[in-house]
Amino acid sequence: MRALIDMYQRIGLVPLIIVGLVLGILIGWLMPSVGVALGLLGSLFVGALKAVAPILVFILVMAAISQHQGESQVHVRPVLIMYIFGTFLAALTAVVASFAFPTELLGLNTIEAVADQAPPSGLKEVLTTLLMNLVDNPVNAIANANYMGILAWALIIGLALRKASATTRTMVSDLSEAISNVVRFVIAFAPIGILGLVANTIAETGFSALMSYGRLLTILVGCMLFIALVVNPIIVAFNIRRNPYPLVFTCLRESGITAFFTRSSAANIPVNMNLAKKLGLHEDTYSVTLPLGATINMAGAAITINVLTLAAAHTLGVPVDFGSALLLSVVATVAACGASGVAGGSLLLIPLACSLFNIPNDIAMQVVAIGFIIGVVQDSAETALNSSTDVLFTAAADPIMKNKTA
């Protein structure tokens, strides 16, 4: 048994994830019943990540703030600027792509609308939800994975603990290290979890449902790849003043792949924390920016909102001028930042964006239904972009990366 564990550790996580991915595709395709059964492994893995993430963020942020010294370097502001700027550029990219490759949504009037969740009535509701999350009960925040509330309480308690005795602060630091060890243990099961997730997805959905929306998916994924491989590297290069691609590919490989299959930025927080520690980044910074990024850094969501909204407008023959498209980009940026506070995420913010072009709500909800049909790919790619960008921008703002030789 020990020899098997040693071999597992020696091979490395990324090669094992690739093996799990290939096996999952084959099992889901060739043996659907087995694939569905293996879905339990994926559910357990995602459940473990989601369970450990809130307490990890709370303890890690509290420990980092309580141990923070006046001369320590914290770089939260530049990361926040990159988050918002990157999300806006993603929204603009989606607009340009939608104008360059106009897409019609097939069967828009024949698809049953999604009615089990109510979309927000406007930006005010989105922002109100976001702000109310800040003042949530701390126990409730941890129990429901409300990361805005968790961050707020962790910061407040961390600041209060600065005046605590050295012994108390050491205990908090030791607790933080213990939670980090638990996270490393959970992440070690990523290949098995991804095998289960992929096998179950292929077994239940197959490939046929995606084929009819091939053009729409191509534009969505193409925009996300453009942001990940062109726009983000430019932003990073401007900050670290050297070739950004080694860092970009590291983040995509070690964060993006896991996020693609878990389809949860919150579940991927422990993975990002682990990567940030491996890169040698300042804990005072990444313990705050990574959970914050999982809440407000939503470039993928902005792309999804704009592409589907403009596709609906094109299908219905609604004219969209440059000013309206620019306004849509601003609205999508603000709405995307609040996507984590909306049940259903980016898809249920589409009616909000559609309202800018007077598209009826029943039609907008049919667009949401199309989003759920392609969600296997759309949501996976969106989460991979969002989560890998969290750790990428955090690293780009850290002087450690600037000081490393290319």
Swiss-Prot record:
Supply the InterPro entries for this chain: Na-dicarboxylate_symporter, Na:dicarbo_symporter_sf, Ser_Thr_transp_SstT
Q: What is its main location?
A: membrane
Return any one Pfam family short name.
SDF
Question: A Gene Ontology molecular-function term?
Answer: neutral L-amino acid:sodium symporter activity
Which parts of the chain are coiled coil? none
**GO biological process terms on file:** serine transport; threonine transport
What does it catalyze? L-serine(in) + Na(+)(in) = L-serine(out) + Na(+)(out); L-threonine(in) + Na(+)(in) = L-threonine(out) + Na(+)(out)
Membrane topology designation = Multi-pass membrane protein
List GO terms (cellular component aspect): plasma membrane
Gene3D superfamilies per the UniProt record, alphabetical: Sodium:dicarboxylate symporter
As for subcellular location, the record says: Cell inner membrane
What keywords are assigned to this protein? Answer: Amino-acid transport, Cell inner membrane, Cell membrane, Membrane, Symport, Transmembrane, Transmembrane helix, Transport
Question: Membrane-crossing residues?
Answer: 11-31, 45-65, 79-99, 141-161, 185-205, 216-236, 298-318, 330-350, 357-377
- What is known about what this protein does? Involved in the import of serine and threonine into the cell, with the concomitant import of sodium (symport system).
* Similarity remark: Belongs to the dicarboxylate/amino acid:cation symporter (DAACS) (TC 2.A.23) family.
This protein's name: Serine/threonine transporter SstT
Species source reads Psychrobacter sp. (strain PRwf-1)
